[in-house]
Design a protein with these regions (language model features):
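Glycine-rich phosphate-binding loop of ATP-dependent small-molecule kinases
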Residues: 1-322
Length: 322
């Protein structure tokens, strides 16, 4: 699954400069403690995290003076990019429902839903595909996870998940929304491992469809180029080999003679787990300050592996990779 995801992600990224290239926006919504964060974390581990941007916003009461989606437009992905967006405009929609309670203006609610649908269709028409995933669990599982030591850090909808009345209202509205919009993928969060795989497969299917569509449109726009690539003998200007031999530049000794600090596998895993835990705590205590880690060096020198080990204990909403 990871290999397939990276293959499609690489294809998407390599097509970013093309006329028919597309971006992918993944909207993540649903119940608290239903496995949303775990699923996105697994996705970033199975793919190249450099080309996935993860955003999260808290639900706000929608303004009457601008479209409900207006404040979220800066999180949209560019061509060749993948963006995962927790909360998003649906968190604002749910916030409106709970703020209004029994005095909800059904006409305004319907208008906001129609505005969202029009905006999403406009994104698709302008080469940004959308995958919408709704996570849910039953009440028994929710109650158990709410008493766990590490609950979901993002209270996206500003509601009390310990109150049965709030949970019932949330489920009632989510059922209504699912009935109005058939574009949602329902992710069952009862089994975390299974929901991670289900979510990843939904993303994989979307990437494959996007890449196939881009390739088909490229072939339609450039039939001559397609014919030449299939028949290289027809190329009017074949690439000529360089007559000069390749001469590698001498490297500084410190770059090729790195001092080795080998560890036993058991010691390595123990130290790694301990230091990852300390690092995660320090990062979460930074307050409003930003922390920047800069990696530089030779290809295949371990930069990517080091980055993966640093982000492993973190929530995808806590970091961005450039």
């Amino acid at each position: 699954l990871s290999f397939d995801l990276i293959t499609e992600q690489t294809t998407l990224h390599e097509q970013r400069a093309g006329k028919n290239s597309r971006g992918l926006l993944i909207l993540v919504n649903g119940m608290e403690n239903s496995g949303k964060g775990e699923a996105v974390k697994a996705l970033t581990e199975w793919m190249d995290a450099r080309y996935i941007k993860v955003h999260a916003t808290m639900g706000q009461h929608p303004s009457r003076y601008q479209p409900i989606w207006q404040r979220h437009t800066w999180q949209l992905p560019r061509k060749g990019e993948i963006a995962v967006y927790f909360g998003n405009w649906y968190a604002d929609l749910i916030r409106y429902v709970f703020d209004c309670g029994d005095d909800i203006d059904e006409q305004r609610l319907q208008q906001m839903i129609e505005d969202i649908e029009a905006f999403e269709q406009d994104l698709v028409n302008n080469n940004t595909d959308i995958v919408k995933c709704w996570f849910s669990v039953d009440n028994k599982t929710l109650k158990k996870r709410l008493t766990d030591e590490e609950p979901d850090p993002e209270q996206l909808y500003h509601l009390d998940w310990f109150r049965k009345k709030d949970v019932k209202r949330f489920k009632r509205f989510s059922s209504k929304l699912m009935g109005l919009q058939s574009s949602w993928h329902h992710i069952d969060g009862q089994d975390i491992d299974a929901s991670n795989i289900q979510f990843a497969n939904v993303v994989l299917a979307a990437l494959r469809t996007m890449n196939q569509l881009s390739a088909a449109n490229d072939a339609q726009d450039n039939p001559a180029k397609t014919d030449k690539s299939a028949n290289p003998k027809n190329d009017e200007n074949p690439i000529k080999p360089n007559p000069l031999p390749f001469k590698p530049t001498p490297l500084i000794g410190e770059l090729v003679s790195v001092e080795s600090h080998a560890l036993e596998k058991a010691d390595y895993k123990k130290q790694l787990h301990s230091k990852q835990h300390i690092l995660a705590e320090l990062i979460r205590e930074r307050g409003q300050r930003h922390i920047i880690f800069v990696f530089e060096g030779m290809d295949a020198a371990g930069k990517g592996g080091a980055i993966r080990r640093i982000i492993a204990p973190l929530d995808p909403r806590e970091f961005t990779i450039h």
